[in-house]
């Protein structure tokens, strides 16, 4: 099966928004052992949409079309598909009724413009969208099925998981015997990871891929076929062994997700005091439902005054060592933990740049501390020649990893190949 994707929208084509839908769709398909062969982005011009539908339908077996199903004048996907096939738009009575029901349930009057969303190409097969007003549909043109989906990410994901994937599996008799293991790493570059993994002899049916999503690099181990699936745990173990401390999570998208899963329902509590990371550590945890069960508070103590008055940092410590120092960040962590007697507290203070560095403490210098009931762990890392955003995200990741290792009763401070560390 040859799968392609057509992304629509002037804002996507012009770069006004980042096309996260395409990235999510490609990643999701890959997890099911299906690779996208081509992706095309086209603006909101009727003639361009017609042309790309006609041209790509000669080459693909199935095409996921994303966007252009709304009620406004620049939503042209249904009209373009009808013209590409040489047929009329007709009202889908079933979807019109669903639209009217949707607005009634939400105590709203349906605008006349929304009736456009019930107008589908004459040969279209309706694809249900229980979470929105944009009607999905599919049409056969030349050799391809074109499967039309909403541009709203939540609606797209719902439709792909519940409608698109089952459809292509049935239509093309795809073998569902695919398994995937993901290993999340930090502190080593993609080439360094590959140098360690490539010498491994992989059994037939198992392949390895890499995805950089800083501050992490994700290792994907695919197993296709029953024999390969049986061997997947063993291969995963070998990969983890050669990568050592670089592996920080399995089947998690971020270290924040790993920390959340370990603290949730654990009875343990966490507080956070952040300077250079500016609430990033706390924010990433709050993204997950249930984080209130373990997260006591997150404090952004950016100024020296706030470090003193909120966290109880000794003014003499700041005078003698500066805000970016091991003594200061240790006192920040202790102070954050003491406020509500949390089990753990993380603290960061650093120079994210692009300015503010000195010869002794250049841009990219970050002090990180973990306070526990039994003591404090701390380190000052070096992240030179990184952007401000990357300095902050790498610092948050190292802080998470310190906590993760403490939760696993492992050495809290470890060496990362691509992250330097000052001696205390």
From Swiss-Prot:
Top-level taxon: Bacteria
NCBIfam families associated with the record: cinA_nterm, molyb_syn, PncC_domain
Family: Belongs to the CinA family.
Alphabetized PANTHER family for the sequence: NICOTINAMIDE-NUCLEOTIDE AMIDOHYDROLASE PNCC (PTHR13939), NMN AMIDOHYDROLASE-LIKE PROTEIN YFAY (PTHR13939:SF0)
Protein name (record): CinA-like protein
Species name: Shewanella sp. (strain W3-18-1)
């Amino acid at each position: 099966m040859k799968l392609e994707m057509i992304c629509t929208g002037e804002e996507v084509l012009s770069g006004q928004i980042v096309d996260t839908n395409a990235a999510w769709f490609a990643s999701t398909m890959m997890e099911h052992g299906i690779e996208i062969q081509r992706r095309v982005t086209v603006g909101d011009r009727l003639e361009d949409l017609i042309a790309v539908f006609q041209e790509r339908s000669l080459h693909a077996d199935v095409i996921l079309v994303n966007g252009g199903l709304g009620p406004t004048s620049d939503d042209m996907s249904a009209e373009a598909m009808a013209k590409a096939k040489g047929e009329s738009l007709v009202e889908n009575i079933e979807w019109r009724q669903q639209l009217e029901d949707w607005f009634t349930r939400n105590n709203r009057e349906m605008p006349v413009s929304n009736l456009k969303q019930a107008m589908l190409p004459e040969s279209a097969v309706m694809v249900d969208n229980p979470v929105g007003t944009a009607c999905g549909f599919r049409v056969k043109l030349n050799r391809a099925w074109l499967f039309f989906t909403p541009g709203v990410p939540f609606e797209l994901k719902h439709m792909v998981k519940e409608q698109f994937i089952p459809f292509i599996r049935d239509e093309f008799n795809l073998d569902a015997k695919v398994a995937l293991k993901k290993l999340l790493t930090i502190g080593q570059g993609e080439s360094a990871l590959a140098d360690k993994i490539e010498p491994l002899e992989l059994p037939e049916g198992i392949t390895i891929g890499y995805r950089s999503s800083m501050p992490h690099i994700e290792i994907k181990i695919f197993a296709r076929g029953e024999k390969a699936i049986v061997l997947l745990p063993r291969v995963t173990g070998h990969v983890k062994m050669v990568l050592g401390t670089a592996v920080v999570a399995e089947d998690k998208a971020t270290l924040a997700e790993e920390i959340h899963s370990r603290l949730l329902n654990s009875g343990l509590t966490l507080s956070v005091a952040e300077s250079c990371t500016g609430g990033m550590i706390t924010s990433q945890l709050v993204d997950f439902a249930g984080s209130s069960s373990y997260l006591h508070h997150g404090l952004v103590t950016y100024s020296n005054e706030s470090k003193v008055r909120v966290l109880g940092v000794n003014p003499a410590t700041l005078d003698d060592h500066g805000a970016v120092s091991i003594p200061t960040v240790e006192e920040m962590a202790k102070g954050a933990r003491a406020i509500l007697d949390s089990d753990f507290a993380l603290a960061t203070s650093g120079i994210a740049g692009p300015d503010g560095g000195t010869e002794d403490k250049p841009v990219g210098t970050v002090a990180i501390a973990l306070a526990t009931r039994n003591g404090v762990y701390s380190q000052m890392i070096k992240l030179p020649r990184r952007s401000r955003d990357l300095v902050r995200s790498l610092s948050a990741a190292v802080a998470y990893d310190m906590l993760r290792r403490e939760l696993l009763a492992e050495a809290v401070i470890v060496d990362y190949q691509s992250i330097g560390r000052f001696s205390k």
